[in-house]
């Protein structure tokens, strides 16, 4: 088993079987039922299949398919050195289909000092968020662009303090998320020690809200957050605010709405640019959630309380 495969923690799989698994994701079936209804994720699956087909075709014509990747580098141990883009040439015929596969191959074979975050490799943890060819996304879900005539440029999430290379400081992002109090708040426990029950209809209202993986792609693509990171919570935090405002089990929904609308630096700092929705790797729509909270506040729409099931 090669050093790359050891780093990836997996064995060589059957290419034909892998293609069948990816094909099943286009309809949300097979091994990927969670992709059903997520257009952005299904588009990524289509791009991956296309990338694999093109790479396989080129592999049959040439022994190697070299592509250039320009990666942002900066070492805090050398504070007098300016950041720069370092070029790496990777053979796509011996690499996985995603950008994260490229980074792991580079770290294993070319430069062990390359720093980046990664964990699940399944688009669940949000660790490997970065900017790839000008778009914030997670590297494990971003297919490699098979066009070898131009390089792929990989940089850290924009307008964030860089710790090293592709690793950024997310402290403020998590603090803004925490300020939304993302947990169930009730005035009294349910009778007889039961769990807080919820009807299927009320549970359906949370779809498209709870799936956030806190990758910070949306927040770091928002100009309002760029210029006011200490005051404006950002799209990810506001999406979570709406998630709990929409939860029928929560008994502080009015207070939550008041907390984010009493100051112009909160929900009203959003200018509806919608970069957040365009860049979300999970296909969520923070801009819509923010608009709905504005509407609830401006129209004085009372939040309907529901009875326990």
Swiss-Prot record:
Residues that hold a ubiquinone according to the record: 227
Any one GO MF annotation of this record: 3 iron, 4 sulfur cluster binding
The UniProt record lists the keyword Repeat: no
Superkingdom of the organism of origin: Eukaryota
Cofactor section: [2Fe-2S] cluster; [3Fe-4S] cluster; [4Fe-4S] cluster
Binding, [4Fe-4S] cluster: 212, 215, 218, 280
Record: residues binding [2Fe-2S] cluster: 120, 125, 140
Top-level EC class: oxidoreductase
Residue span of the annotated presequence: 1-22
Keywords noted in UniProt: 2Fe-2S, 3Fe-4S, 4Fe-4S, Electron transport, Iron, Iron-sulfur, Membrane, Metal-binding, Mitochondrion, Mitochondrion inner membrane, Oxidoreductase, Transit peptide, Transport, Tricarboxylic acid cycle
Membrane topology, as annotated: Peripheral membrane protein
Transit peptide found in the keyword field: yes
Annotated 2Fe-2S ferredoxin-type domain residues: 69-160
Catalytic activity: a quinone + succinate = fumarate + a quinol
Matches recorded under Pfam families: Fer2_3, Fer4_17
Binding-site residues for [3Fe-4S] cluster, renumbered to this chain: 222, 270, 276
Localization per Swiss-Prot or TrEMBL: Mitochondrion inner membrane
SUPFAM superfamilies referenced in this protein's UniProt entry, alphabetically: 2Fe-2S ferredoxin-like, alpha-helical ferredoxin
One GO CC term, this protein: respiratory chain complex II (succinate dehydrogenase)
Principal location listed in the UniProt entry: mitochondrion
Pathway involvement of the protein, from the record: Carbohydrate metabolism; tricarboxylic acid cycle; fumarate from succinate (eukaryal route): step 1/1
Enzyme nomenclature, EC number: 1.3.5.1
Function: Iron-sulfur protein (IP) subunit of succinate dehydrogenase (SDH) that is involved in complex II of the mitochondrial electron transport chain and is responsible for transferring electrons from succinate to ubiquinone (coenzyme Q).
Subunit structure: Component of complex II composed of eight subunits in plants: four classical SDH subunits SDH1, SDH2, SDH3 and SDH4 (a flavoprotein (FP), an iron-sulfur protein (IP), and a cytochrome b composed of a large and a small subunit.), as well as four subunits unknown in mitochondria from bacteria and heterotrophic eukaryotes.
Protein name per Swiss-Prot or TrEMBL: Succinate dehydrogenase [ubiquinone] iron-sulfur subunit 3, mitochondrial
UniProt organism field: Arabidopsis thaliana (Mouse-ear cress)
